[in-house]
Structures are given as structure tokens and as C-alpha cells.
From Swiss-Prot:
Subcellular location: Cytoplasm
Disulfide bonds, paired cysteine numbers: none
Descriptive protein name: Rho GTPase-activating protein gacD
Stretches with biased composition (Low complexity): 68-91, 122-143, 421-435
Site keyed Arginine finger: positions: 217
Record's compositionally biased regions (Polar residues): 1-16, 105-121
Pfam families: RhoGAP
């Protein structure tokens, strides 16, 4: 077979081979599909054909290069593919072997016949019975490339979308961000005042909030708390007790007022060492010698009410330990809340000792605070306001009787507490005496079990004898509870709410394992 590159163009309507005579063969050899690479080189014949404007020249070349059915044509080389060698001419409307990969259609094709030098156009695709030679002469164009999104990009978008959805479902509440000072609360900082503390606690007593389950642990309605906050601006008027505000709203107001006051009730800067008072004597010395007089008065009145709440723990599920967890972040604060402040960092690492300090004050109030919080303070300007606020309304007589009865219960309970050894758990007090023996035995057993679980964790958290194994022991105990008694452990976590859980996790995660 001759090389196509040796073809040349003679005068019009003639086509001859160079370097030999035409040889007649009975059967031309089968044409082979040219390799796809390297790309085809344009020959002189192809260039002339591309520049030709006469359809007859194209027909002449086609007749010379296509073998006839009778075998009379020479076994010369043929053009590999007319569709791939020619361009559209200016005088011809032929579309040579144009395929579409998308819809499998084909335009008119150029075919040679054995009847003469004519060109026929066919609008239909070649039949399946076409010769192998014709099929081999056709070079299909490459398929159309469809652009699909990158699998890696799609996977990454899905992951990010899933993370955002999980974040918005489990994002912390706005109030919790206020408590952590991540967001600035929409309340103007208040000056710590005994009058406002007295007004809030008086409203709590009138609503009988002491018998509300989860008091100070369950968050109140944010809008109601904001409305109550505005009422504190009018010092002369008491907080109205109506159906618009629940006990949880008033409890939230009390914590908010302590948290947003300009000066903390118990500043961390007053501690001479990072260690917080852990005994009754240390706490009494700290209160008498370190705290300002107004702060002592506010703290005494607040602890007195929290003591009353703890005595109703069989109803409200709030024992001294739970109250310590809820109030420690609001009472013990640093004057400078900048995270880079050393006192702030000490507060974050000693948060459990702060909770224990508040629990100590509640359980030993009469030994730590001497004077009554309602006794006149020398040089105080609040006495006249207090007299106006304490003026009894027709419904206050029942409240005073209840308050007197609660005080008697407190005194009797303290006598019972002091008869127990200091090493015993003070939270397992027989609450049947406080409630006059009322309540079924099942409820009492549940309360004892919950209290025992609280006491067990506090014992683990404060047991220094465990040393470096303290963290692993606590985690192992939590894992065992979750596997063996999951319902009880989940109920324990629900009772702690967000503040207690955060305090527990912060303490565990900051334990040193070295």
C-alpha cells in the first residue's frame, strides 16, 4: 500500500499515482482505521481539496480514491476520512459525516457510487449492512464532555450543611450566653442594693415559690424577666405579684440581678489565696472581716431564704448542694471579667470550691451570720424605704404566719443537723418531720436516692485522697451509672440543668492527671 503523503494533484479531472503504473487487483485490501495519535498530517491533496471551490473536483477525487464494486479500480491509497480531512467549502452546502453524540443523529454523508462521477447526499444514517470499509473510513468525532460537580466539593458542602444544622438545633440559649458574658445583656448594670434583693425575695415568698419544683434551676420566660427588671427602677414600689409572672420568672430575676450588678456580692479579689474558705470558722472570719457591711446584709438575707428553700427539697428538689451550684457563678465573681485576668482564670479552675462555699453558708447560716439581715444598719438610707415596703396588705397576715412557721422549722432543723457528726452527710435529713409526716414512702425513697447520688458525686469531687486517679474514677463512675442505671443518671443530669452540668464538666476536665 502506498503512503498517502506521496499523493499529488494533476490537472483537473485527473488523478495519477507518482512513481509507478496503476496496478489492477481483484480485491482491494481492507482499509484500516488510522491511529488516533499522533494527529493526522494534512497532505498536498488535502490542502488543495480544502481550497477547492468546485464540487466536481471533490467528486473526481472521491471516485479515484474509492474502489469500485467490480474491482477495476487500482489498489491505491485512499483518503482516510473525507469527513475529517475537508472543511466546509464556500460553494458547497455539504456536511460531511457530522455526528451528534447527544441525540445520535447524523447529517448528510458523502458517498461515492459506481455509476459515475456523481455525489449523492443521504439524510439517513448508514444502515447496519454497510461494508466494513465504509465503517472504517469514518472517524467519529469525540463525544461531548458533560461537566458534573466534583464529588469532593459535593461531599464537603454536605458536611458543612450538616454541621450548621446540628449547631442551630443544639445552640445555647441567649440567656446562657448572657450568664457567661459572651454576649452583653440588654440590661443596664445595676448597683447592688439590699432594697432590690428584699423586693425580689418578698415577691417569691408571696407566690409560695418555695414549693415550686426546680426553683432557681429551671429558667423563666425571658420577656417576663425583662419586664420585672424594669420594675426594679422604681425603688419605692414593690414588685406586683400576679398571674403574668411565675415563680421561675422571679427566680430568674434574682439570679440576673446578682449577675449583672456592677460590683459582685462576693468579689474574688477579697480572697488572699486561691483557696476558698472551706470550714465554718474560715467562712465566719471572711464574712466579718473582708466583706463590706452592705454586702454582708444582702448575703445574709439571701442565704436565709435559700436555707428555707433547701428545707423544702422534698418538694422543690433543691437541696443545699443544688442551690450552691446555681448561685455560685452569680455570687462569687471577679470585678474584672476579662478572660486574661488571673482572678478570672482562678475562678474557672476553682468553680467547684465556690459551689461548696455557698453550700457551707446555707447549711451553717446561724453560725456564720450573727445579726439579722432586717435589723437597721447604721448610716443606711434604706430604712424608710423598707418600712414602706414592709407595710402589710390584707393578704400578708397569712404570709407572716407561714414565715414564722418556716423559721421554727429552721431552728428545729439546725438542732437536728448539729447532733450529727461533721463527717456525715447533712443532706439526708428526715424530711418527714419538716413536712409533718406527710407524703408517701415511695416519694421519700426517691428523694433519698437522688440525694445520695448528689452526695456521692460531691464526695468524689472533693476527695483529695484519690490524687491523680480522681479524674478517671469520676469518669468511670459516670460511665457505669449510664450503662447500669441510665434512667436515674439522666434524671440526675436533668435536675442539675445547664449550670450544674457546665460546672461538673469544667471541674472534671480541669483535673490534673499527672
Amino acid at each position: 500500500m502506498s503512503n498517502p503523503s506521496k499523493l499529488s494533484i494533476s490537472p483537473p479531472n485527473t488523478f495519477q499515482h507518482v512513481g509507478g503504473s496503476n496496478l489492477h487487483v481483484n480485491k482491494p485490501p481492507a482499509l484500516q482505521s488510522p491511529p488516533r495519535s499522533p494527529p493526522l498530517q494534512h497532505t498536498t491533496a488535502q490542502n488543495n481539496l480544502a481550497k477547492s471551490t468546485s464540487a466536481s473536483n471533490i467528486a473526481g477525487i472521491a471516485n479515484q480514491t474509492t474502489p469500485s464494486s467490480s474491482g477495476s479500480s487500482s489498489g491505491s491509497s485512499s483518503l482516510n476520512s473525507i469527513g475529517s480531512l475537508t472543511k466546509s467549502t464556500s460553494n458547497s452546502n455539504l456536511n460531511i459525516n457530522h455526528y451528534s453524540s447527544g441525540n445520535a443523529t447524523m447529517g448528510a454523508s458523502l458517498q461515492s457510487t459506481n455509476t459515475g462521477n456523481t455525489i449523492t447526499q443521504s439524510s439517513s444514517p448508514p444502515s447496519s449492512s454497510s461494508s466494513t470499509n465504509n465503517n472504517n473510513n469514518v472517524l467519529p468525532l469525540p463525544n461531548k464532555i458533560l461537566h458534573h460537580p466534583s464529588p469532593k466539593k459535593t461531599t464537603k458542602s454536605t458536611i458543612i450543611s450538616g454541621k450548621l444544622k446540628r449547631f442551630f438545633k443544639s445552640r445555647p440559649s441567649r440567656d446562657s450566653l448572657y450568664e457567661k458574658h459572651i454576649l452583653s445583656a440588654p440590661f443596664s448594670s445595676a448597683t447592688l442594693s439590699f432594697i432590690n434583693i428584699f423586693k425580689i425575695i418578698t415577691a417569691l415568698k408571696k407566690t409560695n415559690a418555695i414549693e415550686t419544683e426546680g426553683l432557681f434551676r429551671v429558667n423563666g420566660n425571658a420577656e417576663s424577666v425583662r419586664s420585672l427588671w424594669l420594675m426594679l427602677n422604681n425603688v419605692q414600689e414593690a414588685i406586683p405579684v400576679d398571674g403574668n409572672s411565675s415563680a421561675h420568672d422571679l427566680a430568674g430575676l434574682l439570679k440576673l440581678y446578682l449577675r449583672e450588678s456592677k460590683f459582685p456580692l462576693v468579689p474574688l479579689e477579697l480572697f488572699t489565696s486561691p483557696a476558698v474558705p472551706a470550714t465554718i470558722d474560715e467562712a465566719r472570719v471572711f464574712v466579718e472581716e473582708k466583706l463590706p457591711t452592705e454586702n454582708v446584709r444582702v448575703l445574709s438575707y439571701l442565704i436565709e431564704y435559700l436555707e428555707q428553700v433547701s428545707l423544702k427539697s422534698s418538694i422543690n428538689k433543691m437541696n443545699p448542694i443544688g442551690l450552691g451550684v446555681c448561685f455560685a457563678p452569680n455570687i462569687l465573681r471577679s470585678v474584672n471579667t476579662n478572660p486574661s485576668n488571673p482572678q478570672f482564670q482562678v475562678h474557672m479552675t476553682n468553680i467547684q470550691s465556690h459551689c461548696n462555699f455557698i453550700t457551707l453558708l446555707i447549711e451553717n447560716r446561724l453560725k456564720i451570720f450573727k445579726d439579722s439581715a432586717l435589723s437597721p444598719v447604721q448610716g443606711s438610707n434604706d430604712d424608710e424605704i423598707l418600712e414602706n415596703l414592709i407595710i402589710q396588705s390584707p393578704d400578708d397576715e397569712l404570709f407572716d404566719e407561714q414565715h414564722q412557721h418556716e423559721q421554727e422549722l429552721i431552728d428545729s432543723s439546725h438542732e437536728h443537723h448539729h447532733s450529727i457528726n461533721n463527717g456525715d452527710n447533712n443532706n439526708n435529713v428526715d424530711t418527714s418531720n419538716v413536712n409533718g409526716g406527710s407524703g408517701d414512702e415511695n416519694n421519700q425513697s426517691n428523694v433519698i436516692n437522688d440525694t445520695a447520688l448528689y452526695d456521692e458525686f460531691i464526695s468524689l469531687l472533693t476527695d483529695e485522697s484519690l490524687g491523680s486517679s480522681q479524674k478517671s474514677v469520676i469518669i468511670q463512675r459516670m460511665t457505669t451509672l449510664f450503662q447500669t442505671d441510665g434512667d436515674r443518671f439522666k434524671s440526675f443530669l436533668r435536675d442539675m440543668q445547664i449550670d450544674g452540668i457546665i460546672s461538673l464538666l469544667e471541674y472534671i476536665l480541669t483535673l490534673d492527671e499527672n
